[in-house]
Amino acid sequence: MKPRTLVELSKLGLGNETVVQLRTLELPVDYREAKRRVTGIWEDHQPQLVVHVGMDTAAKAIILEQSGKNQGYRDADIRSFWPEGGVCLPGSPDVLESGVCMKAVCKRVAVEGVDVIFSRDAGRYVCDYTYYLSLHHGKGCAALIHVPPLSRGLPASLLGRALRVIIQEMLEEVGKPKHRAQFEENSTMVLPAKGN
């Protein structure tokens, strides 16, 4: 995903009821580095919700992913590495589900000019791997949004607005209306505001 989309989102914020702090960090398409950084996010910040945003070059719509998979990682990353045995976390469940009901969010989200769909297969690559790790560390308090590449029909401004609406709905879904959000390139953390 292009960082300028998150710049757009940071300009928009998440609305008046939500205190928002935006930061970006691009996660490389690297299994080991993604694992290190995602683990650090959960250990260092203990967020209430992490929303990963990854680009799917074949996507024609924004895709809300319900689950992450533990096995099947056979494609090499940018460093020609893949997890041993194609497994993210040996001994962990095959599938972890998000605590956010993506189907419900998908039904409630309407952004003119952007299709939003629901999926249960995030693709067994670094995005899915990262998502599974977050679901594991956060005990289901994570989400993954796959976005299509930016284009004339989907400029950064429109994608930023769409992500804003989707994340607002996710916050409603988890029932925590007042949060401070920290947005990371390919990972968006939502943390409680101080004093909450």
UniProtKB/Swiss-Prot annotation:
Active site (record annotation): E65, C127, H146
InterPro entries linked: Peptidase_C15-like, Peptidase_C15-like_sf
Keywords, sorted A to Z: Hydrolase, Protease, Thiol protease
EC numbers, comma separated: 3.4.19.-
Keyword Transport: no
GO biological process, any: proteolysis
Enzyme category, top tier: hydrolase
GO molecular function: cysteine-type peptidase activity
Keyword Cell membrane (UniProt): no
Protein family according to the UniProt entry: Belongs to the peptidase C15 family.
Name assigned to this protein: Pyroglutamyl-peptidase 1-like protein
Organism of provenance: Homo sapiens (Human)
Annotated gene: PGPEP1L
